[in-house]
Every structure is written in structure tokens, then in C-alpha cells.
Design a protein with these regions (language model features):
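NAD(P)-dependent short-chain dehydrogenase/reductase
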Residues: 136-187
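Conserved C-terminal active-site "lid" loop/helix of NAD(P)H-dependent oxidoreductases
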Residues: 213-219, 233-276
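NAD(P)H-binding glycine-rich loop region in Rossmannoid oxidoreductase-like domains
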Residues: 37-77, 89
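Catalytic helix-loop patch of NAD(P)-dependent Rossmann-fold dehydrogenases
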Residues: 71, 75, 79, 103-150, ...
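Rossmann-fold cofactor-recognition segment
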Residues: 28-39
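SDR active-site strand-loop-helix element
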Residues: 12, 52-56, 95-101, 150-152
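Mid/C-terminal beta-alpha module of Rossmann-like enzyme folds, strongest
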Residues: 191-244
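N-terminal Rossmann NAD(P)H-binding glycine-rich loop of SDR-like oxidoreductase domains
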Residues: 2-25
């Protein structure tokens, strides 16, 4: 990414994704907690960005925690992104909002991978509802203030972190075996750079092609850590409300970005992970 573009970018939200982007993009990261439009305006005056990447969000320890902390969830996942959208409009700044693909029902027996223009329909989790509310608002704002909404799904990374899918699976020991769309974080960062460089607007699913079945990834991990053991259980045994789905990557590919198959990153991911 060109140095001039880097100088114009400000990241808000210093959690997992925000810090990964800060590290890889080498751009400004605000450490200020945003509570109001005035807070955003202060950061805009301080950094003078042309692009704001919003990585602010709340999931708690997991999405079930959002059911217990609806105030925090609604504030971080809906209220603040809408404030950022208003600030972007007022200051003629582009907003890039990091969203989630966990907003759909999916029927594995007949559905095709979900494209960006399908209307979100998964309201069973409060977390998902807050993500949907935000997308509706930002899509309305986009008619007068172009923005970019990036949907990622179940981040998988090549370094340990509590939010990393591989870290979670190693900890769980008992896992389900359902194909899911996954976002490999190093590829997500490359895709984000690409979308910034082509000045993309609208909604993009940013995940890898194909589907990940958790045992496939853990079998690669077990190849390098032979003592590791895991058990596959039936999804119903979890007794939890979750989204399991496949997202289409066609739009991202048609933008000129080469999307890798998720299965092609397993070795790279595990080898990188074990170096830490």
C-alpha cells in the first residue's frame, strides 16, 4: 500500500483486529475510547485522516456474553459505528467498517454460498442483531457518504490469540464438524489493502474460498503436535445457538483480488502458530 495512503488512515478500536491491522498496515491507531460524536471529532482533528477503519466491537468472552451485556454490545456494535458514519459524512471522510458474516441462516441441503446483497435474516443472537442494525444504517448513509463494509467470519490466524479460531479449538478439545466459511487473517489484511487501493465501496465478504471443517485443521496441528487429542461431538450436544454458513467470495474475486482456498492455508497457519 502506498505511503501516502498509509498517512491518511486512522484505526479506531485497539482489540485483536485493530492491533493486527495496526501492526501490518503501519498506520495510526487511536487509543481513545469513543463514547460520543465529540470524541470522534476530537480524533479527526488530532489525526486528520481521510479514511477511518472501525474495529470497535464487543463480543465478550463469546457471543453468549452479549446476551448478558446487551448495553455494551449495542453501544460498541451499533451506536458507535453509526456515530462514526455521521462523523465521516460531516467531515467528508471514508469509513471502513469491519462487520461480521454471522448474520444469516443457512441450509446446507440447498443454499448456495451467500452473496453480499442477500438481506440478513439471523436474529436469534443479540450479537448478530446489533451487526445487522449497523449494516442497515450504514447502507442508508452510503447513499450520501460512500463507505465500505467488510464482513469477516471466524478469524483464523498464524499466531496465538484468544480470538484466534485455532487457539479456541486447541482449548476446547471437543469440537463440531460442520463446514464453515473462515477468514484467514493474513489474507484478510491483504484483501483490505487491495480494497483500499481500488477505493472500493459497499459490502464485501472477506473470507477464504471453500469451507473449513474443524477436524481438518486440527489434524494438521496434530501432525506437528502428536500428543494433541480432540473429540468430535454432534452439533446438537452443544445446546447453543450459533450460525453455521458459507459466504460467497465472488464479489471480492471480481474486484481483482486472488482469494485462496481455506485448505491451502492450513500448513502455513499451523507452522506460523507454532513458532510463537
Amino acid at each position: 500500500m502506498k505511503n501516502q495512503i498509509k498517512k491518511e488512515i486512522l484505526i479506531l478500536g485497539n482489540g485483536y483486529i485493530g492491533n493486527r491491522l495496526h501492526e501490518e498496515l503501519d498506520v495510526e491507531l487511536s487509543d481513545k475510547r469513543i463514547h460520543s460524536l465529540a470524541d470522534v471529532e476530537d480524533e479527526i482533528k488530532r489525526f486528520k485522516p481521510a479514511i477511518i477503519i472501525n474495529c470497535i466491537g464487543y463480543t465478550g468472552s463469546d457471543v453468549d456474553d452479549c446476551e448478558l451485556n446487551k448495553d455494551k454490545t449495542l453501544t460498541a456494535n451499533t451506536f458507535i459505528p453509526i456515530i462514526l458514519g455521521e462523523a465521516a459524512l460531516r467531515n467528508k471522510i471514508k469509513l471502513i467498517h469491519i462487520s461480521s458474516g454471522c448474520i444469516y441462516h443457512f441450509d446446507y441441503s440447498g443454499d448456495k454460498p451467500i452473496a453480499e446483497d442477500k438481506i440478513p435474516d439471523f436474529f436469534e443472537l443479540f450479537y448478530s442483531r446489533t451487526k445487522i442494525y449497523t449494516e442497515v444504517a450504514l447502507r442508508a448513509l452510503s447513499k450520501v457518504s460512500p463507505n465500505l463494509i467488510i464482513r469477516i467470519r471466524v478469524p483464523l490466524d498464524n499466531r496465538p490469540h484468544p480470538r484466534n479460531l485455532l487457539t479456541k479449538l486447541i482449548k476446547y478439545k471437543k469440537i463440531i464438524d460442520i463446514p464453515n466459511s473462515i477468514t484467514y487473517v493474513p489474507d484478510f489484511i491483504k484483501a483490505l489493502k487491495h480494497l483500499i487501493e481500488i477505493n472500493a465501496n459497499g459490502i464485501y465478504n472477506v473470507c477464504n474460498k471453500g469451507a473449513l471443517r474443524y477436524p481438518e485443521l486440527l489434524d494438521v496441528y496434530k501432525k506437528y503436535v502428536p500428543d494433541f487429542e480432540y473429540t468430535v461431538i454432534d452439533y446438537k450436544e452443544l445446546n447453543l445457538v450459533r450460525t453455521n454458513l458459507l459466504l460467497s467470495t465472488r464479489k471480492l474475486e471480481e474486484s481483482g483480488f486472488k482469494v485462496r482456498q481455506i485448505k491451502d492455508v492450513f500448513e502455513e497457519c499451523v507452522k506460523g502458530y507454532l513458532k510463537y
